[in-house]
């Protein structure tokens, strides 16, 4: 049986391993190897695993939206990383793993709001708030609105504690996924991550916005459970969310299961362990949206199947097709593509390829990566990748 203290130690050990990685001058190569997306904005760098990352290496589990600021001269981190939650997944993926960890001090069910996950912190040097999603540091307008929706008490706390990070769920009519909140817009605080130790604390949030919490020390959208009563409590909790659409929306997504430590009888550290989605939500989420679904087919140029291995490798990188991308794709292409993505604002646009890729569009504003651009389909059904490969050859990206 794992105690909460043991779990917190493991939680922080994963972060410590990550901090050792980024102290190494070759951290970019290590991130490429482990399939961690690295996005730069000035001195700030964001780390987020992608869907190719197997998460077998412990430190990669901390890369669920981590911001690190590096010194431009030494290449070393200026300060401790700004963490989000460590990686957690659907409970059904590894039920024995989660159930074992849940046998400890305190377990909590929390409603899983169906919106956009945002991070907000105060930069003590630039003296301004930073709003980011998990995968990028360049939040567009629909996410920046989160700053204006933030409770001013939380804003004051963040200003007084630079680099403490608010984790929140942003709900607006513009970012509806499945759950219908009847046109409402709101920002639900999930936790405040201490910059000192990287731990998400409800105790901090409770001090700042006490009216968001119940007498038992839990946020209003939570309830205690135990491993023995989890399944029954889960059914009752789900029914409660269904019966209260004004609070939880129509077709609520499900729950997150938190492991918590107690301090003076109230929850202190609260770390999400797993998520359990409702069957109704999954069935609706899986239905076609009305848009024509893209059929899976072999890549082709001008209507003819392409067998050139370089094209297939490049296509696989963009589509994240391979299970083991290290052995089956072209590292050089991936490195060049990443370099373009990281430096798109100052990139040299001399080549025809770069001019076509960038054009006059503000790609950062639209939140698109170069992978998106290369897979963009024209009115003839061809991707940019196909066009470049056909026009300039296998080494078009050089």
Curated annotation (Swiss-Prot):
Pfam families: RNA_lig_T4_1
This protein's name: Uncharacterized protein ORF64
Natural source organism: Ostreid herpesvirus 1 (isolate France)
């Amino acid at each position: 049986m794992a105690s909460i203290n043991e779990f917190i130690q493991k939680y922080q050990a994963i972060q410590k391993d990550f901090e050792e990685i980024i102290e190494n001058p070759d951290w970019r190569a290590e991130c490429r190897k482990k399939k961690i997306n690295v996005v730069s904005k000035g001195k700030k760098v964001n780390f987020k695993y992608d869907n190719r990352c197997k998460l077998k290496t412990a430190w990669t589990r901390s890369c669920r939206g981590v911001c690190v600021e590096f010194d431009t001269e030494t290449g070393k981190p200026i300060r401790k990383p700004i963490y989000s939650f460590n990686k957690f997944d659907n409970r059904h993926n590894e039920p024995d793993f989660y159930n074992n960890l849940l046998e400890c001090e305190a377990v909590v069910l929390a409603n899983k709001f169906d919106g956009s996950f945002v991070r907000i912190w105060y930069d003590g040097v630039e003296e301004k708030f930073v709003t980011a999603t998990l995968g990028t540091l360049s939040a567009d307008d629909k996410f920046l609105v989160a700053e204006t929706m933030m409770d001013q008490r939380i804003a004051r706390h963040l200003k007084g504690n630079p680099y403490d990070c608010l984790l929140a769920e942003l709900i607006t009519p513009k970012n509806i996924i499945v759950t219908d909140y009847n046109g409402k817009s709101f920002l639900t605080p999930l936790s405040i991550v201490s910059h000192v130790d990287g731990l998400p604390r409800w105790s901090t949030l409770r001090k700042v916005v006490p009216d968001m919490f119940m007498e038992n020390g839990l946020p209003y959208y939570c309830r205690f459970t135990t491993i023995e009563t989890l399944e029954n409590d889960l059914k009752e909790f789900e029914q409660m969310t269904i019966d209260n659409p004004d609070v939880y929306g129509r077709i609520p997504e499900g729950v997150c299961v938190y492991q918590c430590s107690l301090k003076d009888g109230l929850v202190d550290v609260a770390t999400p362990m797993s998520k359990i989605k409702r069957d109704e939500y999954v069935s609706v989420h899986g239905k076609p949206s009305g848009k024509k679904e893209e059929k899976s087919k072999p890549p082709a140029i001008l209507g003819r199947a392409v067998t050139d291995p370089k094209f297939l490798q490049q296509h696989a990188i963009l589509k994240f097709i391979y299970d083991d991308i290290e052995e089956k794709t072209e590292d050089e292409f991936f490195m060049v593509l990443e370099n373009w993505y990281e430096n798109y604002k100052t990139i040299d646009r001399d080549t025809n390829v770069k001019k076509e890729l960038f054009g006059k569009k503000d790609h950062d504003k639209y939140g698109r990566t170069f992978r998106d651009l290369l897979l963009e389909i024209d009115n003839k059904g061809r991707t940019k990748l196909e066009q470049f490969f056909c026009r300039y050859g296998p080494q078009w990206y050089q």
